[in-house]
From Swiss-Prot:
It is found in: Cytoplasm. GO terms for biological process: base-excision repair, AP site formation via deaminated base removal. Its main location: cytoplasm. Pfam families: UDG (PF03167). This is Uracil-DNA glycosylase. The keyword DNA damage applies. Belongs to the uracil-DNA glycosylase (UDG) superfamily. UNG family. Its EC number is 3.2.2.27. The gene is ung. It catalyses: Hydrolyzes single-stranded DNA or mismatched double-stranded DNA and polynucleotides, releasing free uracil. The keyword DNA repair applies. Keywords: Cytoplasm, DNA damage, DNA repair, Hydrolase.
Amino acid sequence: MAHSIWHEKIKSFLPEHYYGRINHFLDEAYTSGLVYPPRENVFKALQVTPLEETKVLILGQDPYHGPKQAQGLSFSVPEEISAPPSLINILKELADDIGPRDHHDLSTWASQGVLLLNACLTVPAGQANGHAGLIWEPFTDAVIKVLNEKDSPVVFILWGAYARKKKAFITNPKHHIIESPHPSPLSSYRGFFGSKPFSRTNAILEKEGMTGVDWLK
């Protein structure tokens, strides 16, 4: 399901048998309709970014709900898929902050310790937030609580009001929070553009004696 160390730590913040409830939910959802991402990618964020390597969290709300977009990493799409509006704005801010990046697939960020997590890990086709409030929030809140327990610093990048509510779980003074409005077209000009989250993250990591992220890779 997820990287084994993640699995053991997350379980400690969940009611007993919660993983069984998740599996039942997934069985029902994927047999009753079209759901994104593909089932094998539901836990991809936790599979490709081990807990011990995680130094940044970028929290999204739920997967893209269009065909072939969602791949289990927040804001990322496969390389051959056109960038959705929020990702276009993320890449625009990155270009203004550090430099241009042409890739739509953010897997190389994930492989450098950037956990690309959505608060909801599944979505029905064409129905944004269609699985909100059903099963995922206790699980992904537990992920944030696990990160909060880390001894090494983590930079939490929280875009938009929904993500910023999760600050309540970040109580460890070792960690850092970068927050701004969401990169969606509705809010990007209200403070997302010009917020420089990428250079600010690297400045924090380097000050903490850690390696910065190659955001252009």
